[in-house]
Amino acid sequence: MIRYLLSKLLLIEAVLLLVPVSVAIYYQESSQVFIALFSTIGILVLLGGLGVLRKPKNQRIYAKEGVLIVALCWILWSFFGGLPFVFSGQIPSVIDAFFEISSGFTTTGATILTDVSVLTRSLLFWRSFTHLIGGMGVLVFALAIMDNAKNSHLEVMKAEVPGPVFGKVVSKLKNTAQILYLLYLALFSLFVVIYYLAGMPLYDSFVIAMGTAGTGGFTVYNDGIAHYGSSLITYLVSIGVLVFGVNFNLYYYLMLRRVKAFLGDEELRAYIIIVLVSTGLITLNTLHLYQGVS
C-alpha cells in the first residue's frame, strides 16, 4: 500500500508541474526550461505509472505506515520538485535544489539563493507554488483530489496535519480534505485580488499570495516586500500571514455560524496572545530606532 500511494503522489506532482509549464508558455521562455520541466514530468509519470500498475489487495493504512508515507512523500516530492532547477542549470547542485524546494513544501522559507532574479518566471512561480501546496499539507491536498480517498487514510492525514489534534469536520475523510482545501484556496484567491488592487502586478500578486498562504514568505525580488515601497502592501501581507496561521477547522466553524466554537478555541486564543505579546515586545525593543524619523 505504501508503494501504491507514493506512486499516486508522484503522478499528482507530475500534474502540478504543468502549472509552471503554462507560465513558461505564457512568458515564451527558452527551450531549456521546457526540456527541464517535461523531463521531470516524464520521470514522475514513468515511476508513478509503474507503481500503480498493481493495486494492493489490502488498502488498510496503520499509524506507523501513515508516518512513513508522509516522511517519504516529503522527501520524494522535494527531490523531484527540485529537478527542473537542476536540469535547467538555474540551480546546478542537486542538494541546493532539494533544499530550496523542501523549504517550499515545508513552508520554511529558507533559501540558498542570494539572487532570485537568476530564476525564470516559471521556476520562480513553481518555487512559490510549493508554498501554496505545502501550506495545508501535501497529503491533505492529495487526499482532497484522490478519487478513492478513504477513512482508512486517516492515519496519513493525522501524521501530516500540524498540531496536537486532527479532527474530521465531516464524516468522510475526502470531504474533510476537500472542504479545508476549498477554504484555503478561497482565502488565497481573495488575497491575490487584494494584492492586485493594492498595486502589485498580477504575476507578483499570485507569487506573494502563495508565499502568504504557506506563511513561508518566498517573494519575487531580493528585497522582498520592501521592493514595492508601500506600507499598505506591507500591512496587507502581515494580516494575510496571520489569517493563514489560524487552524482552518475554525474557519469551517465560522461557515457553520458556530461563533462560540471559534472564539472559544484554546489554540486560537494562545495564537492571538503570542502574536500580541511578541509584537509588543519587538515594538518596545526597536522603538528607539525610529525616534526622530518623520
Question: Can you annotate each of these PLM segments?
Answer:
Residues 1-294:
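Membrane-proximal intracellular helices of multi-pass ion channels
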